[in-house]
Amino acid sequence: MNHLTGLSRLSADSITGLLDTAAGFKQTLRSPNASFSPTLKNRRIALVFFENSTRTRFSFEIAARNLGAGTLGFSAASSSVSKGETLSDTIKNLEAMQVDAFVLRHPSSGSAKLISRITPKPVINAGDGSNEHPTQALLDMFTLREHFGSLKGLKVTIIGDVLHSRVARSNIYGLLRAGAEVGLCGPVTLIPPDAEKLGVRLFTDLDRAIAWADTAIVLRLQLERASGTYLPSLEEYSRHYGLTDERLERTGKHLLVLHPGPINREIEISNHVADRIQPPGYSKSMLLEQVTNGIAIRMAVLETLLGGTP
C-alpha cells in the first residue's frame, strides 16, 4: 500500500492489517504513561487541509508526534493558494521541501487520487468532497470490532444524509469488504440513486432500520447542502429520522450508536442518545471512544505507509 486515497479498492487483508496494527497502538494508549518507539523520527508530514477540521486534523497531528514525526500545518487562506496557486503546484512545492507524506482534505471529490498520481510520497485522504473519508471509516470499523469482537455478519445501519456523506461511502466499502451487512436509512432524496447496486439494504422507515440493525452510524445532516429540494424542513427531518430515546424505547432495541461528528444536536441525534455512555437506557454512545480510536487508526496508517528506514 503506497497511498490511502479510499477504501473502495482496499483489500480485506489490508483493512484487517490496519485494524490489527491499531489494536496494538490502542493497548499502549491505554497506559498511564504511554510511550511509543519513534519509528517515524525525522519524517515530515504535511497536513494540507483546505476545509475546517477538529477531530481529523488534531488526531493526525497527535498520531504523527506519537511516532516521532514532525508535522507542517497548512492554511489555504494564508498560503499561495489565495493568490491562485493550484493544488498540484502546492503539493510539488511542499515535496521540494523534503516533505515525506501528505494528509489532504479538499472540497473536490477525487483530489486525493489526483495528487497520488503526481507525487511518489504517500498521500492519505482526510476527506475529499463527498467521495471518501477512509480513516474515519477505519476508526468506525475498529470501534465496532472492539465492541462486538468481529465485523463478519454484523448488521450496521447508516442513518441520514448518505447522499452527501464521504463517511458513508467509505464505511459502505469497508464494512461490506469485512463481511458486515449494511443498511441505509433516510429520506429518498438523501439516498444515492445507485445505492442498491452496492449490495446494501434500503430503509425509509427508521423504526424498521433500527429493528434490523445491531448498531447505527448516525450521519451529520449537512445543512450547507441538504436544504431546499432535499428536505421540506429540519423539524420534519428530525421527527422522522432523529435518533431519540423515545424511538429506541418504542423499538425495544438496545443500540450501539456512532457518529463521525460534528453533531447537530436535537436534529439527527438527541442530547441523551449522544451523551449516554452508561446504562440505563436503550443505547450506548461511542462518540468519544471513536475520537480516541482515531488516534490509534491514524498511527496505524502512518506506520504502515512510512514505517522503516527513510
Swiss-Prot record:
InterPro entries (UniProt xref): Asp/Orn_carbamoyltranf_P-bd (IPR006132), Asp/Orn_carbamoylTrfase (IPR006130), Asp/Orn_carbamoylTrfase_sf (IPR036901), Asp_carbamoyltransf (IPR002082), Asp_carbamoyltransf_Asp/Orn-bd (IPR006131)
One GO cellular component term: cytosol
Origin: domain of life: Bacteria
PROSITE patterns tied to this protein: CARBAMOYLTRANSFERASE (PS00097)
Alphabetic keyword roster: Pyrimidine biosynthesis, Transferase
A GO MF term: amino acid binding
Catalytic activity of the protein: carbamoyl phosphate + L-aspartate = N-carbamoyl-L-aspartate + phosphate + H(+)
Pfam families cross-referenced by the UniProt entry: OTCace, OTCace_N
Record EC number: 2.1.3.2
Transferase as UniProt keyword: yes
Residues given in the record as carbamoyl phosphate binding sites: 55-56, 105, 133, 136, 261-262
Pathway in which the depicted protein is active: Pyrimidine metabolism; UMP biosynthesis via de novo pathway; (S)-dihydroorotate from bicarbonate: step 2/3
SUPFAM superfamilies, per the entry: Aspartate/ornithine carbamoyltransferase
One Gene Ontology term from the biological process aspect of the record: amino acid metabolic process
Residue numbers binding L-aspartate: 83, 166, 220
Function field: Catalyzes the condensation of carbamoyl phosphate and aspartate to form carbamoyl aspartate and inorganic phosphate, the committed step in the de novo pyrimidine nucleotide biosynthesis pathway.
Family label: Belongs to the aspartate/ornithine carbamoyltransferase superfamily. ATCase family.
Quaternary state and interactors: Heterododecamer (2C3:3R2) of six catalytic PyrB chains organized as two trimers (C3), and six regulatory PyrI chains organized as three dimers (R2).
Protein's recorded name: Aspartate carbamoyltransferase catalytic subunit
Organism of this sequence: Chlorobium phaeovibrioides (strain DSM 265 / 1930)
